[in-house]
Amino acid sequence: MAGRRAGLIVQICVLAMGLALGLAPPARAETSSPFDAWAVVVVAGDWRGAGGGPTKAFDNARRDIAARLSDRGFDADRIRQFSVKPESALARQATAKAIYETLSAESAQAPGCMVYVTSHGDPQGVVVGDLILPPNILGLMIDRSCGAKPTVVVVSACFSGVFVPALAKPNRMILTAARPDRTSFGCGEADTYPYFDDCFLQVLKDAAHFAVLARGVQACVAAREIREGVSLPSEPQIWIGPQLRPLLPLLTFAAPASP
């Protein structure tokens, strides 16, 4: 009798443990993004609008693009922001030297790099503060920091297509807001974002990977410029190196956060 009672107690204990395990919430699988260790630099290179007065367009884009990248799988702690007029601890003072030093430090152990610059531009390069950052110098900065790692470079500025020849490497994707001989739009004093940056934010919300993002941004900018009656479209440029091209569909963004 005592043996039967002991056996019954053991069975009850086993049953209770099984019920407890069955009722416990399932363990969550650890998920990671292919971009969660990438080095990212996002730069707002000017504070002046097209008319010379102050504008928030570039800093709005810098702040919100950094946030959207974090939402899609980039580690917020690895995203470094730069502004000509930083208004919070999130952004550092934008100079070519500071950008290069930060990119070099952050990319040392990173598997990939992303550089995003939004500013005014001219056929010689992109504005960073009171200086022009030319394509060959930006190219050297990225060569010496990111090297052969997968790298995505986005330049949102007038005439930004001039950066493609200097930056094009087999391991890189280059996306620019305009052809080398065209202006881009939306950098006035009253604009919230430049058109290109606005489209980047919209398309990044749901895009699967960078190649889809780039094509979507091109289409979005073209549609916006038609709506606005732009007579000479900016024609954003895409260049994808042969080493990176087959990898991009595998480097998928994390699922967007629920609204």
Predicted regions and their residues:
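Boundary/activation segment at the start of structured domains
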Residues: 22, 26-111, 186-194, 240, ...
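Solvent-exposed loop/turn segments at secondary-structure junctions
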Residues: 46-50, 85-89, 119-125, 131-132, ...
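A short, glycine/acidic-enriched catalytic loop
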Residues: 108, 117-147
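Active-site-proximal C-terminal subdomain of hydrolase catalytic domains
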Residues: 152-241
